[in-house]
Amino acid sequence: MPRSVFRLILVLAAAASLAGCSRALDRADLVFLNGAEPESIDPAVITGQPDGRVANALMEGLTAFDATGTAQPGVAERWDLSADGRIYTFHLRRDARWSNGETVTARDFIASWQRTLTPEVAAEYAYQLYYVRGARDFNEGRLKDFSAVGLRAIDDFTLEVALDNPTPFFLDLCAFVTLLPVHIPTIERCEKAGLNWTKPENFIGNGPFTLKEWRIFDRIRLVKSETYWNRANIGMKSIDILPSGRPMTAFNFYSTGLADLMADKGLVPTPLMNELKHRPDFHAAPFLGNYFIRFNCKRKPFDDQRVRLAFSLVIDKQLIVDKITRAGEIPATSLVPPGTAGYEPPPGLSRDPDRARQLLAAAGFPGGQGFPIVYYLFKGDSDLDRDIAVELQGMFSRELGITIQLQQQEWKVYLASLSSLDYDLCRSTWVGDYADPNTFMDMFVTDGGNNRTGWSNAVYDHAIEIAARELVPEKRFEIFRGAEKILISDEAPICPLYYYVGIQFYDATRLGGVEPNLLDEHPLKSMYWKQR
């Protein structure tokens, strides 16, 4: 088929797809391709980046990330920090409003954080609040009286937060999705009536946009909030957020003008990467992200660290970035990307197939003999994940004599499988929540909400705990280096593959407010049209 005809078919298919699901909605000011359909916009539930992008447009924390990924004043217009670095006093804006016109108060934040920490809510990211005095004990059921947690509303507009230890990244945490405030009266009313409080007809937020429509697997329509304190500086009157897990479909929408912005690396068709990265609307920059493999340490044969190490030692990471990803990614030997807040990780593992085969034989599987059937789990809507899975399958077969089976799952099912440890080994990713090694390292403490490997190591746990209290940066980094050696080189519950490169497609001569940054944060409130 001629190339021009093929492209025309793609254009018509994309247009038909959009027209078939748009119904009565006119085109929004900005159309944004967001990746997978969000699982939720409840801050206590959110674990994925697509969900967080939507929530951050609908709600605003004490601080908020700007276009450069820097935490700036949000609902809190300023704050004070005690001399010992343990007590923050936040001064809230008197003109901060919920979308129903009510004032946002210090008590709203306390009630929202209490909800996230309530054990019955089972918030996976509740640990992001553990820096607050008493928060962990309350979340884990040892403390029953929430008034003993280090949160105090001095008055409607003054919130005091007492930390266990000085936490240099706490202001970044205050901008993170888990710490966003929710409108508790609405949640209570909806739960009593058996309603879903996140539906457009029920939702009350305090962010720069409000939720007008949510059509599953079609679009989320946001409109500029009339009650947001900084509404005069919001550039877009309306935004459509489109879900698309298929890179070719997403790119067709973008390239035919049906979408204005594509800011999820997983939506870039990898077979076209070498051609696409030379386009003027292709924007790439390093950011704090890692693509890695998780091993289920509770399930044989990966309960044996020798098996985990054997698998890790035969992976040709350079081949993966050269053959598949092709956007300038760097093979990873650590979980924490080098240079994160000045941190340099330990050396990690180098590829060593001979040692891998020795370890596998010592574990009772010489030449792969007797190795059970195992499944590599990955997202079924991602061509990139599939291509990496096929390449890994070949490496394990050639070097270890083991043929793994490939298992694809839809995004929500995949997340559930990880959380319930219903997998053997799986594709995983992590994007830093803030610019500090801790955002990567504290994932793998025993029973951590994002551990999802079943791995536990008391020495590692203690190191992460001690690092949280260490005030001298180099001493703190040395503690992290020792812990990361345990994680990657000694016990290997995970195997890092490569460090992420953030990719966005947009016309920079027309669209402003999209900036490369280490957190890959691109707030919708910052975007505006230079020209249409």
Name each region found by the language model:
Residues 33-84, 114, 202-205:
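N-terminal lobe/hinge region of extracytoplasmic solute-binding protein
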Residues 36-53, 75, 102, 124, ...:
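A structural "hinge/loop" feature
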